[in-house]
Amino acid sequence: MRALWIMAVLLLGVEGHLMQFENMIKKVTGRSGIWWYGSYGCYCGKGGQGLPQDASDRCCFVHDCCYGKVNGCDPKDDFYVYSSENRDIVCGEDNPCTKEICECDKAAAICFRDNMDTYQNKYWFYPSSNCNEESEPC
């Protein structure tokens, strides 16, 4: 029951395009991004520090790095256009900045799908106090 309450609170914090990212993850992996990756390891969810704990957490680390390279728009608020067919995502956008956001999200969703076998429940709601190592450069 506590986990459901926490997920409800996390959903309240999802704004703008982050719901698009949630939908994209669900289309590519068949899983809810908020439920499975909303608070996972050292990088999935809000913030990020230390070293990624496994390949799934590394997907979030790389996603954070990708967002850090986006210039001219806000990756967490700006909307983009994409289509999907059979779990394939096509970012279709005239605006190069929002297309870049879409490509970051697409890469993360594919990474989650390709690394689903690395997901470990012990990293779900992993305490940030365990993420004290020096972070890798992007």
From Swiss-Prot:
GO biological process terms on file = arachidonate secretion; lipid catabolic process; negative regulation of T cell proliferation; phospholipid metabolic process
**Which cofactors are named for this entry?**
Ca(2+)
Q: Which residues bind Ca(2+)?
A: Y43, G45, G47, D64
Q: Which cysteines are joined by disulfide bonds?
A: C42-C131, C44-C60, C59-C111, C65-C138, C66-C104, C73-C97, C91-C102
Question: For this protein, what is the EC number?
Answer: 3.1.1.4
Question: Catalytic activity annotated for this protein?
Answer: a 1,2-diacyl-sn-glycero-3-phosphocholine + H2O = a 1-acyl-sn-glycero-3-phosphocholine + a fatty acid + H(+)
Q: Which residues form the active site?
A: H63, D105
Signal peptide segment: 1-16
Q: What GO MF annotations does this protein's record show?
A: calcium ion binding; calcium-dependent phospholipase A2 activity; phospholipid binding; toxin activity
Presence of the UniProt keyword NAD in the record: no
InterPro entries the record matches: PLipase_A2, PLipase_A2_Asp_AS, PLipase_A2_dom, PLipase_A2_dom_sf, PLipase_A2_His_AS
How many cofactor units bind, and how? Binds 1 Ca(2+) ion.
Record PANTHER family: PHOSPHOLIPASE A2 FAMILY MEMBER (PTHR11716), PHOSPHOLIPASE A2, MEMBRANE ASSOCIATED (PTHR11716:SF9)
- Name the family: Belongs to the phospholipase A2 family. Group II subfamily. D49 sub-subfamily.
Q: What is this protein called?
A: Acidic phospholipase A2 Ts-A6
Organism encoding this protein: Trimeresurus stejnegeri
